[in-house]
Amino acid sequence: MKAISYARFGPPEVLEIGERPEPTPARGEVRVRVHAAALNPKDVLLRKGKMRWLPAGSLPRIPGYDFAGTLLDSAPGLPTGSEVFGMIQRNGGGASAEVARVPVGELAAKPSGLSMAEAAALPLAGLTALQALRDELGVTPGQRVLLNGASGGVGTLAVQIAKALGTEVVAVCSGRNAALVRELGADRVIDYTSEDPTAERGLDHVFDIYGNLPWPRAKAMLHSRGRYCTTVPQPGAIVRGALRRAGLHRAALVVVRSKRADLERLSRWVTHGALRPVVDRTLPWTDAVAAHEYLETRRARGKVVLTFDH
């Protein structure tokens, strides 16, 4: 099968475009013919060797977590040939190939109103936003939440999900992305190039998506019972997360989990017009090096997606 892989750690140029053996699904897994695979920062970190402490399998390795495609095997409630989307939980990934093996609990029926590229842009970023806002922060209608990094893959979905959950959204992004973020539903936009987001006070929640607003700076922005969540590990963040879930602390790290029920929740929002993924650019799988280079600029508005022709 056609696949993107790397046999050593390094810059985007270590990515190889070529043939790899088709995967054999284990018990509880199915094969998906991948039509589109979205990129995520985790792909970059693993390719660079920055997360070698994670059990991600041996090299060579096929990257990729987000996918949309068609089932080559039947899954519960989804016959062979069904259009599906999902996120592969295992650290080794494997979605950046013509065929991926996926646990049956990590995929769901593709929202009918989305293209394959749009559907592939939804899972990891959408699950991260949902699980941070709902589970780690516990947002409720009427609360005020600040989203730091509102124009990227997670951020564009977090704006919409926070609105769907009934909150007032204060979005932080650059001026060039302000119109997009307002269009997605933000109640107020802070242009970090001309305003200081940390001047905000009395917030119910701060969700640091971009990773440059650590807890020591963010806590002054919150009221006395306000909560903070980040996507980026910080010293003590995992411990604080456990304490926060026990009601003993106000800061947490979101660790995304691929769950069919949550994928279906995202899909329902899409169907009802409350959520749409934002795709910055779509490239053929053979342009994987260029796609990774662009993702590393951290300038993408929404997601970068690779497509496979079948």
Placement of each model-derived feature along the sequence:
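C-terminal capping/lid region of NAD(P)-dependent oxidoreductase domains
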Residues: 274-278, 292-310
